[in-house]
């Protein structure tokens, strides 16, 4: 595999981010002393963040929110703001409905193309005794969303990547999107430097998303290698509907999302023998091979794969090399129309190259001003287009594919 400059650039970035700690990272971390937000009994019951929407379509929508104390929660919804006559709860396990602070309620069997109004409701659990449950304050918040028709003719979405604990970049880059019309926002990994605690997740991603779009437009999120790091990395997935692999259809596109894992070898001393990403990628490759044989994949006018570490052109570290070994042969055989990635911190468009990638590959930029990008993807049955812009709004790359 060819050796490129991106790996060294990433190392320089990481060194720089440590030096910047006092200004950009250490201050937030200093306020994140506890790994879970502990709330004293004197604090009023409330919503810490949310609601925020996530989905992989198929006439379902997940509504998530976090309360500052344990609660029983549900969603009331309907096609009119004055008639929220439907009710949904979080997934029951072993006959028990959820009771806690992290809430995820999935609305199912929604009507295609219909606007839904919803209200999240949480009822504080003041005292939980074996035969007596005492409730306290009830709180709520409202929102609306359109349930996208999976068979719609035209789709559009926006990709962001490699934000690296710079929360102001999220609304800044979204604001540059002139059309402001997206079926979803896609976060392609490394939104954080590493996982510290709940406050970091709220302050550096969830709250900026809620403020900008996430109460009415869903986002989809896959981990980058940095989300696999830090003391809170094992708790991190509970704050989202999904941060791993997925496959779904929207309009003329079959989407496949791969979780590329860590870029260091599993035996690296910093992981102390508690990771297994090589096997994880191998298992995903088997899953990908099965997905590529599915009718949904084969019959789609376009096939788009989204993965944080690119299948090539990202240096010679262990993770990128392993991604090339296990994923690229499948991508080349599977008639993939476009791959969207990040990781290198250097934006680039790689057109198909004989003996390498049979598909166009867009790699988004980095976290620093002047390197940040957003990528706008649109598709109908005749054309798939992806245009990458830098943080001045200037076009810096384009791919157009026809069936």
Predicted regions and their residues:
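Active-site neighborhood of phospho(di)ester-bond hydrolases with catalytic His/Asp-centered motifs
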Residues: 159-161, 185-189, 219-225, 305-307, ...
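N-terminal active-site segment of His-dependent metallophosphoesterases
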Residues: 44-50, 55-74, 79-99, 112-115, ...
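Short S/T/G- and acidic-enriched coil/turn segments that sit immediately N-terminal to beta-strands
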Residues: 100-104
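Short, flexible loop/turn segments at beta-strand junctions in immunoglobulin-like
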Residues: 107-111
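Extended active-site neighborhood of metal-dependent phosphoesterases/phosphodiesterases
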Residues: 106, 117-147, 199-297, 326-335, ...
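N-terminal secretory signal peptides
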Residues: 1-8, 22-26, 34-35
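Binuclear metal-dependent phosphoesterase catalytic core
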Residues: 43-66, 73-77, 248, 348, ...
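Short acidic, glycine-rich surface-loop motifs adjacent to enzyme active sites
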Residues: 295-315
